[in-house]
Amino acid sequence: MKGTKKEIHIDDKVIRYTHIEKGSSAVCFMFSGSGYNYDKPLFYYATMLMLEHKINVVHIHYSYDGQLMEKPMEVVTKVMMDDINPIINEVLKSGQYNDSMFLGKSLGTIPIANDLMKREEFSQSKMILLTPLLTFNSIFDSILHSRHEGLLVIGDRDHQYNADQIEQLDHSNLKIEIVNNANHSLHVGEYETENSIEAIAKVIETLKEVVRTN
C-alpha cells in the first residue's frame, strides 16, 4: 500500500501527505489521532478496504504538541484546517475526483465535525468518525445536526462515550457502531487480544457496508 509522499509549502511551513492512487474517481481523506497514526490497525485496514473498493486514499501527516488541546476548540479547529485545507484543495483541483469521503480517528474527527461537515461542497460526502471527541459540545452538536451518511464507531469504555448522547445520535443518518468493553483505542478489556482483533474486524466489516452503499 505504498503511496506517493508529497508536500505543500505554505509560508515557512511544510505540510506532508501521502497519496495512494489506484486511478479512481473517488478519494478518501484520512485524519489520524494524536498518537494513533496510519500504521495502526484501524487506519491500516481502512486504507486497504478503500483500495479494495477502488477508492484512492490521502493520509495527511500533521503533528501537534500536547498544548494544542488546551486551547479553545475554535482555535484547535483552525490550526488543523490550516494544515488540511491546502492538501484537500491540491488533491481536488485536478478534477479527477467526483466523490470524496472523510475518515478521522479521535483528534482527526475535529476537522470533520467542526468544519468539513458544515461545508456545502461536501454535503454528499460520507463521514466516518472513529472514537469522536463527543465530550466537546461543538463536535456532538455538529454530528447531531448533520445530514451526512457514514459511520460513527465508539467503545462503551471510551472516556468520550456517553449513552445519552449516543441515543440522540441514533436519529442522525450515521450508522452507529458501539464496541462492547472497548476503550479509546478500541482495545477490548485490558489484554484481550482475540476480542480486540474481532472488534476491529467487525468495524471494518461495517465500514465496508457503508463504503459499498451509494
Predicted regions and their residues:
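Serine-hydrolase catalytic machinery in alpha/beta-hydrolase-like enzymes
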Residues: 6-97
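Conserved alpha/beta-hydrolase "acid-adjacent" motif
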Residues: 39, 158-165
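Gly/Ala-rich beta-loop-alpha elbow adjacent to hydrolase catalytic centers
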Residues: 102-113
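A conserved short beta-strand
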Residues: 122-134
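Acidic catalytic loop of the alpha/beta-hydrolase fold
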Residues: 135, 156-161, 184-185
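Conserved loop-alpha-helix segment in the C-terminal half of the alpha/beta-hydrolase fold
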Residues: 162-174
